UniProtKB/Swiss-Prot annotation:
InterPro entries on file: AAA+_ATPase, ATP-synt_VA_C, ATP_synth_F1_bsu, ATPase_a/bsu_AS, ATPase_alpha/beta_chains, ATPase_F1/V1/A1_a/bsu_N, ATPase_F1/V1/A1_a/bsu_N_sf, ATPase_F1/V1/A1_a/bsu_nucl-bd
MF (Gene Ontology): ATP binding; ATP hydrolysis activity; proton-transporting ATP synthase activity, rotational mechanism
NCBIfam families found in the cross-reference section: atpD
SMART domains: AAA
Gene: atpB
UniProt similarity note: Belongs to the ATPase alpha/beta chains family.
Matches recorded under HAMAP family: ATP_synth_beta_bact
SUPFAM superfamilies for this protein: C-terminal domain of alpha and beta subunits of F1 ATP synthase, N-terminal domain of alpha and beta subunits of F1 ATP synthase, P-loop containing nucleoside triphosphate hydrolases
Residues at which ATP binds: 172-179
CDD domains recorded: ATP-synt_F1_beta_C, ATP-synt_F1_beta_N, F1-ATPase_beta_CD
Reaction catalysis annotation: ATP + H2O + 4 H(+)(in) = ADP + phosphate + 5 H(+)(out)
Name of the protein: ATP synthase subunit beta, chloroplastic
GO CC term, one of those recorded: proton-transporting ATP synthase complex
């Protein structure tokens, strides 16, 4: 972190201005720049190209040094479009990595990768800035407390609980509900959460970013009347941005979150949607830099890049960062190098299933694939652990019996297995839940279900007390009392039809 003089734009001192280079080559978003002998910029230094294009339009492109090629030449990646750049244009070495505004001034605002506001609400106070490239906290600074982070979503809290100050991944293919789930988590957690949140939109749809901004204004997380009282900072580098911006926007969001943790000593929520796009952008840049591709065409530095980002997302003795990251799974293949590399860094994984989504069960969280390091009796307690294990056992048995049911039918099963199937189908439906952010699509009001209520509901299903209720009574309800009330309504409706 550094304190800048009062100014509304980054200052390039006269000393740094003397270190000038010239563009020698432009290959899409990658520039080769020649500097005078002995004045080579460091790796990750920010370079600024200023000038005018052929029609006289002002150009201001920031790049980041990636390679020193020899012969006084460096290769840099542009953070914005390179349209209008020409060979021979002047390039200024700023002498430092890219720095972005941090602190209270960022709350309620939308930024791009360079830390520039893009919400038309005027300039941001840039007296306090921080470089986006930093080392992870030292081992002795880390905090090891274990506590549960309640989300109000039944399937998450029961089967794969989140750790406060931990890293959580939401895995799923295209169109199974990752962004809706992350928006519901923002709605449930950010509203109740006393600290601040930072949202990093990495390579996702601009429309979703706009929807989220509107949602936050409506819910009061962003206070339009008094921006300073807002609880969230938004950083967007969406699908239409060059790969350099998509590769670095996650670091910009993380830098803002680190300031709240280290300097303000707050508990921070960091949402990243989508971490796969960070890897994808790195893959594009890697190819442009001339590196030999690795497995499935990914960059050979995949593990290093992911590690340098993920190791900074951690809890220290000053404060915590709880990170929730959406992870796109290409072709629904969890063994793809991008999701497989991400798995290693997470405390909890919430895996979304296309099979459940096809059945209309939302959130489409797979109860057997989702895992958490927190699901241990010494952390969550015996009652919670036992209930979760019995739910998983029942679901697993139902999965094993599905082939037999498909070939021979339910009637060929033993009495015990038929009972297991009936309870498993009720559990499957009870794991669905109406979301606050999906009220527009479903027409059902959203429900927040506390952990104690969730455990009680599943215990009643497993004990057999609710065997007489129809399974549709458990679909898209909140707690178990709503399911019993829905069953009574269904019974009344069926009698009226007769």
């Amino acid at each position: 972190m550094r304190i800048n003089p009062t100014t509304s734009s980054p200052v390039v001192s006269t000393l740094e201005e003397k270190n000038l280079g010239r563009i020698a080559q432009i290959i899409g978003p990658v520039l080769d720049v020649v500097f005078p002998p002995g004045k080579m910029p460091n790796i990750y230094n920010a370079l600024v190209v200023k000038g005018r294009d052929t029609v006289g339009q002002q150009i201001n492109v920031t790049c980041e040094v990636q390679q020193l090629l020899g012969n006084n030449r460096v290769r840099a990646v542009a953070m914005s479009a390179t349209d209008g750049l020409m060979r021979g244009m002047e390039v200024i070495d700023t002498g430092a990595p890219l720095s972005v505004p941090v602190g209270g001034a960022t709350l309620g605002r939308i930024f791009n990768v360079l830390g520039e506001p893009v919400d038309n609400l005027g300039p941001v106070d840039t007296r306090t800035t921080s470089p986006i490239h930093r080392s992870a906290p030292a081992f002795i600074q880390l905090d090891t407390k274990l506590s549960i982070f309640e989300t109000g979503i039944k399937v998450v809290d029961l089967l794969a609980p989140y750790r406060r100050g931990g890293k959580i991944g939401l895995f799923g293919g295209a169109g199974v509900g990752k962004t809706v789930l992350i928006m519901e988590l923002i709605n449930n957690i950010a509203k109740a959460h006393g600290g601040v949140s930072v949202f990093g939109g990495v390579g996702e749809r601009t429309r979703e970013g706009n929807d989220l901004y509107m949602e936050m204004k409506e819910s009061g997380v962003i206070n339009e009347k008094n921006i300073a009282e807002s609880k969230v900072a938004l950083v967007y580098g969406q699908m239409n941005e060059p790969p350099g911006a998509r590769m670095r926007v996650g670091l910009t969001a993380l830098t803002m979150a680190e300031y709240f943790r280290d300097v303000n000593e707050q508990d921070v929520l960091l949402f990243i949607d989508n971490i796969f796009r960070f890897v994808q952008a790195g893959s594009e840049v890697s190819a442009l830099l001339g590196r030999m591709p690795s497995a499935v065409g990914y960059q050979p530095t995949l593990s290093t890049e992911m590690g340098s980002l993920q190791e900074r997302i951690t809890s220290t003795k000053e404060g915590s960062i709880t990170s929730i990251q959406a992870v796109y799974v290409p072709a629904d293949d969890l063994t793809d190098p991008a999701p497989a590399t991400t798995f290693a860094h997470l405390d909890a994984t919430t895996v979304l299933s296309r099979v459940l989504a096809a059945k209309g069960i939302y959130p489409a969280v797979d109860p057997l694939d989702s895992t958490s390091t927190m699901l241990q009796p010494r952390i969550v307690g015996e009652e919670h652990y036992e209930t979760a294990q019995r739910v998983k056992q029942t679901s697993q048995r139902y999965k094993e019996l599905q082939d037999i049911i498909a070939i021979l039918g339910l009637d060929e099963l033993s009495e015990e297995d038929r009972l297991t199937v009936a309870r498993a189908r009720k559990i499957e439906r009870f794991l669905s839940q109406p979301f606050f952010v999906a009220e527009v699509f479903t027409g059902s009001p959203g429900k927040y279900v506390g952990l104690a209520e969730t455990i009680r509901g599943f215990q009643l299903i497993l004990s057999g007390e609710l065997d007489g209720l129809p399974e549709q009574a458990f679909y898209l309800v909140g707690n178990i009392d709503e399911a019993t009330a829905k069953a009574m309504n269904l019974e009344v409706e069926s009698k009226l039809k007769k």
